[in-house]
């Protein structure tokens, strides 16, 4: 699961700026969509930032403001 900033989300590839990867999400997320609706908790493992290009995307989710803050603040 990736979090980042995109200006275009249609097509075969999506470029994300400042992307972060969730390496592990904890049970309290109740699935990957919890990462978009509440953001990662202290028990999740989040990787460092990088600009990336993703291919063959299966889903793009809007992230609520509170969840964005938690992604940005994750260690």
What do the predicted segments below correspond to?
Residues 1-75:
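Conserved RNA-binding domains used in RNP assembly and mRNA/RNA metabolism
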């Amino acid at each position: 699961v990736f979090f980042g900033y995109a200006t275009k989300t249609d097509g075969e590839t999506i470029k994300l700026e400042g992307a972060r990867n969730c390496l592990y999400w904890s049970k309290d997320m109740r699935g990957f969509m919890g990462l978009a609706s509440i953001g990662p908790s202290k028990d999740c493992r989040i990787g460092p930032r990088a600009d990336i290009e993703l291919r063959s995307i299966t889903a793009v989710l809007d992230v609520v403001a509170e969840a964005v803050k938690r992604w940005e603040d994750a260690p």
